[in-house]
A protein has these predicted regions:
Chain A
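Sec-dependent bacterial lipoprotein signal peptides
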Residues: 1-30
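Short, charged, low-hydrophobicity "junction" segments
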Residues: 2, 101-104, 248
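Conserved active-site-adjacent core of cysteine acyl-enzyme catalytic domains
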Residues: 31-54, 72-74, 83-201
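Acidic, low-complexity intrinsically disordered regions
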Residues: 13, 22, 70, 177, ...
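Generic detector of short, well-ordered, non-transmembrane alpha-helical segments enriched
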Residues: 26-28, 59, 146
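Active-site-adjacent structural segments surrounding the nucleophilic cysteine of cysteine proteases
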Residues: 30-94, 137-139, 203-206, 210, ...
Length: 284, 133
């Protein structure tokens, strides 16, 4: 995965759109058609659309923060691209690193999980979740790194719709989108409030995203996500174990005891559950 | 002599006490909560299995298996019979061989098919698979 940095030159804000159009036109000319059957191993609807994702015009260099702000505002937050930039942007690099996209979303108390293929990307859109994608809008030897938010697709119209940090929505044919996304190593990011689960990703990936919230001290968000996961996978003790730990970290000993007791009733023999339950009881 | 014996004894007692304490410290003396992340990493194996089972449900994988004359239900039963450690080592090998490749989907299919064919004595790709015939 490239630790790449994106975004345009400061004085190129105007040229950017023009260059984009040029690059897109050129690439579209030689693009191989997108083979839906070969690229997808799951059934997805012919078209899907995520309503109400705001269009935020990015400030210079801020396509990463602007993308995160769009997705988080869509979910009801009032965070701005400047708020996110303070957590994510690297001024020396003139852009936002992939890892900082994930980290800043988590430090803002959001579930953040990466995806890497069309199955997952389109499944998320079909489930009503916008997805941030990392693209190279230029060429391999002359990269124009960019983050955009995929909000819709339509196979009949051969179109992928992106909120791309400009005033208007960006529409790309699938083949062209594929080329720009392939040059970004098919890096996509789902960012959701912790009371919603992504459509893609295994139970373990979502558990790890929840544990990562604990790591950045977003314990309240972690607790909500553990509860959401426990409702979806009621037979899995790890959700209750995490819930107990997140509640303990917030000083909620009774809540922690309740969650850990639940974990123990599901998995009576796990030493970690017994140890933490004993610890909580000793402090009550 | 007496002193030497005493010293030896003292050292022996001190050492064994330390040993006992050290082993107990792991199980007993715990001053803080054990982390969620470590538990996920330690106990995630059962889900590795469900991941492989999920891969077996894929159309392209099933088609390959059927083309080899294998009943997919039998393939699932065989996969269920592998130990957690064996499942983990399949996934570790997949990850190693997939590193840097863009054709993950194809490689995964190949791995799953090889796993099944291994178990059915048609191939021997994974070193731990037991041939049933």
């Amino acid at each position: 995965m490239p630790d790449a940095v994106l975004q345009l030159h400061p004085l190129r804000a105007l040229i950017y759109r023009l260059f984009c159009l040029l690059a897109l036109g050129w690439l579209a000319g030689c693009a191989v058609p997108f083979d839906r059957d070969a690229r997808l191993s799951v059934d997805v609807p012919t078209r899907a659309f995520v309503p109400d994702v705001p269009l935020i015009e990015q400030e210079a260099f801020f396509c990463g923060p602007a993308s995160l702000a769009m997705v988080m505002q869509w979910a009801g937050s009032d965070v701005t691209q400047d708020d996110i930039a303070a957590l994510a942007f690297s001024p020396g690099a003139g852009g936002t690193y992939l890892a900082d996209m994930i980290g800043s979303a988590r430090r803002s108390g959001q579930l953040a999980m990466t995806l890497h293929n069309y199955d997952d990307l389109l499944a998320e859109i079909a489930a009503g979740h916008p997805v941030i994608v990392f693209q190279n809008l230029g060429l391999g030897f002359a990269p124009v790194w960019h983050y955009g938010v995929v909000t819709a697709y339509d196979f009949d119209r051969d179109a992928v719709f992106l909120n791309s940090g400009q005033q208007d929505q960006m529409v790309m044919p699938f083949a062209l989108f594929d080329r720009t996304w392939a040059r970004g190593d098919y890096w996509g990011l789902v960012v959701l409030p912790p009371d919603r689960l992504p459509a893609s990703g295994s139970e373990i990936e979502i558990l790890q995203a929840a544990a990562a919230l604990e790591r950045v001290d977003a314990f309240a968000a972690a607790a909500v996500l553990y509860q959401t996961g426990a409702a979806r996978w009621p037979d899995s003790w790890l959700w209750y174990f995490g819930l107990g730990n997140a509640r303990y970290a917030q000083g909620d000993l009774r809540g922690a005891r309740q969650a850990l007791s639940r974990a123990r009733s599901i998995a009576p023999d796990v030493p970690e559950v017994r140890a933490n339950l004993a610890q909580v009881r000793s402090e009550l | 002599m007496g002193i030497l014996n005493l010293t030896k004894r003292g050292v022996a007692i001190a050492l064994s006490a330390q040993l006992v304490l050290a082993t107990q410290a792991v199980t007993m003396a715990q001053a803080e909560m054990l982390g969620t992340e470590a538990a996920i990493n330690k106990y995630a194996q059962h889900s590795d299995r469900s991941f492989l089972m999920g891969e077996l449900q894929r159309e392209d994988v099933r088609a390959e298996i059927v083309a080899l004359g294998v009943d997919p239900a039998e393939a699932e039963a065989r996969l269920a019979a592998l130990s957690d450690a064996e499942v983990a080592s399949i996934l570790a090998q997949m990850e190693k061989d997939n590193a840097g490749a863009d054709i993950i989907g194809i490689l995964f299919t190949v791995f799953i098919v090889l796993l099944v064919t291994d178990i059915l004595c048609l191939t021997r790709f994974f070193n731990f698979t037991r041939c049933v015939r």
